[in-house]
Amino acid sequence: MRECISIHVGQAGVQIGNACWELYCLEHGIQPDGQMPSDKTIGGGDDSFNTFFSETGAGKHVPRAVFVDLEPTVVDEVRTGTYRQLFHPEQLITGKEDAASNYARGHYTIGKEIVDLVLDRIRKLADLCTGLQGFLIFHSFGGGTGSGFASLLMERLSVDYSKKSKLEFAIYPAPQVSTAVVEPYNSILTTHTTLEHSDCAFMVDNEAIYDICRRNLDIERPTYTNLNRLIGQIVSSITASLRFDGALNVDLTEFQTNLVPYPRIHFPLATYAPVISAEKAYHEQLSVAEITNACFEPANQMVKCDPRHGKYMACCMLYRGDVVPKDVNAAIATIKTKRTIQFVDWCPTGFKVGINYQPPTVVPGGDLAKVQRAVCMLSNTTAIAEAWARLVHKFDLMYAKWAFVHWYVGEGMEEGEFSEAREDLAALEKDCEEVGVDSVEAEAEEGEAY
């Protein structure tokens, strides 16, 4: 088996975890108490969903997941919620005091006390796997636990499981909607620390998701539940190929192979289509061509940046539902003829396709319509540099005035770490830009073409 262990860190990670596991259970027909009436093999079995769930002798399915937060309130909601019987109590780990939006508290002072316990739990989960494939780590960039503790944990995982892939789902601080003043500090420190430990990081920007909820689902004031359910759909699309049998299946390591041209440039954009409310879906025919086109609309992206200003390095299309390869090839051929979508000249083919026959499931009473087919596009584009540039700019504004720095230094950080992290991100931004520059011959030709 190729098992995956999900690690949900901090409030954002835990709440997205709730949305994801709720959806996985619906998709696989697993009840909130872990029983699965459709599953005939008791204990183990080689079903695809066993990559995400382990089975006990009593036929109960337990998620291969750990929920960690440095303060108890958010995880307590899982302990008392609908799915409380699904998780083993030891999978829900909480500390006593929170990281107070402070990277240094999550990474140095408070995180240190709990990290060995967490690694011990992860070790127990890993022991239940026959062929552990890797880790999926869910966290936010802006929070103290999400930034500090997640990066500490990833450093330690690199030591203990050096050969296993680590994929992140990270909540990028939204340009407008800010939950903490020090988000730029936390984001830049955590990106710097995890850059060499993460193999692939899917970023999700709250503001982009807000806009999608407002525009496509007509929700005037989206709540975190609305946002998380949409993020859950995306995570589910990305992991569907690991949990179901499909025609063209995509493995965790295959993502990396196809999406990451250089080790540092491992931040693909996710785009999901169709995001549509039930009353609209009733009147629309969402063909493969239409949903494929929708993926190239900047409005449907999960991070605010404009791919039309950058170039695509690689592109993964993950279809699910009633989709046949013939339609996909036609849709992609059409996309390639469009001038607006530019690929870097050293990567001419650039499309990888996965098809999964399991149609998308929706949470009953949720906002999304039940559709026959959906697609999730993961694209590595140089436009992501815009997102880093925004962060670095905000970081500079505060750091120039040395604002809030004492909170970090007081928790045992050194001032040098700030400038070091800032340099690293500036370099990352530069890397993205350089990759997009054409080879010399191409530049001469372009001059003539215009």
From Swiss-Prot:
PROSITE patterns: TUBULIN. A motif (MREC motif) lies at residues 1-4. GO terms for biological process: microtubule cytoskeleton organization; mitotic cell cycle. GO terms for molecular function: GTP binding; hydrolase activity; metal ion binding; structural constituent of cytoskeleton. Keywords: Acetylation, Cytoplasm, Cytoskeleton, GTP-binding, Hydrolase, Magnesium, Metal-binding, Methylation, Microtubule, Nitration, Nucleotide-binding, Phosphoprotein. Some glutamate residues at the C-terminus are polyglutamylated, resulting in polyglutamate chains on the gamma-carboxyl group. Polyglutamylation plays a key role in microtubule severing by spastin (SPAST). SPAST preferentially recognizes and acts on microtubules decorated with short polyglutamate tails: severing activity by SPAST increases as the number of glutamates per tubulin rises from one to eight, but decreases beyond this glutamylation threshold. Glutamylation is also involved in cilia motility. The modification 3'-nitrotyrosine is found at residues 282, 450. GTP binds at residues 11, 71, 140, 144-145, 179, 206, 228. It is found in: Cytoplasm, Cytoskeleton. The MREC motif may be critical for tubulin autoregulation. It is an enzyme of class 3 (hydrolase). The modification Phosphoserine is found at residue 439. The modification N6-acetyllysine is found at residue 40. This is Tubulin alpha-3E chain. Belongs to the tubulin family. The active site is at residue 254. InterPro entries: Alpha_tubulin, Tub_FtsZ_C, Tubulin, Tubulin/FtsZ-like_C, Tubulin/FtsZ_2-layer-sand-dom, Tubulin/FtsZ_GTPase_sf, Tubulin_C, Tubulin_CS. It catalyses: GTP + H2O = GDP + phosphate + H(+). It comes from the Eukaryota. It holds the Pfam family Tubulin. Mg(2+) binds at residue 71. Its cofactor is Mg(2+). The record marks 450 as: Involved in polymerization. Tubulin is the major constituent of microtubules, a cylinder consisting of laterally associated linear protofilaments composed of alpha- and beta-tubulin heterodimers. Microtubules grow by the addition of GTP-tubulin dimers to the microtubule end, where a stabilizing cap forms. Below the cap, tubulin dimers are in GDP-bound state, owing to GTPase activity of alpha-tubulin. It comes from Homo sapiens (Human). Its EC number is 3.6.5.-. Dimer of alpha and beta chains. A typical microtubule is a hollow water-filled tube with an outer diameter of 25 nm and an inner diameter of 15 nM. Alpha-beta heterodimers associate head-to-tail to form protofilaments running lengthwise along the microtubule wall with the beta-tubulin subunit facing the microtubule plus end conferring a structural polarity. Microtubules usually have 13 protofilaments but different protofilament numbers can be found in some organisms and specialized cells.
